[in-house]
Amino acid sequence: MRVKKLVMYLIFCLIPCAIFSQSTIALTLPVVTLLDIEPAGTFTLNFTAPTEAGQSLTTPTANTTKWVNYTSAIASGGLTRRITASVNQVIPGVSIRVQAATASGAGGGVLGTSSGLVTLSTTAANIITGIGGAFTGTGANNGHRLTISLAVNTYANLSARTNTPIVITYTITE
């Protein structure tokens, strides 16, 4: 009887251990840095001339149709990322401004923080900081909504112009 118990013990206890197996997988998580402005395309901001002498120019309504989308996977212990903006040219007497809203939509992770209202120049300025491992979702209504506006800063420097192209360059960097 003792032999029978020993055989049963071997069958039920040791055999399951003998069929246990392991696998080793190689995992790669790349460093990712992607940025997009959605939707694509241009928009127009035009000052309106006054209709009566002594009145100031009417400032155009700010554009709020553009969204910053990004994906960021940083190296272990790596620096957070930031998004900068600059313009290809400044217009004398006019401030070109951008403000990124708080991130919203389908994203997740350590999303960046808006730097508030930033007046753009030909030198890159931070508009979003503190981006860690994150994604915003894609397209409009995901990421950070941009408010792009114009303001007169010095009337003495204004000169008439028509259809002057201003290119805003956005860059994601560490």
Q: What would you call each of these model-derived segments?
A:
Residues 114-117:
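Exoplasmic/lumenal beta-rich domain surfaces
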Residues 1-26:
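Bacterial Sec-dependent N-terminal signal peptides
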Residues 22-112, 125-174:
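N-terminal small/polar-rich segments of proteins
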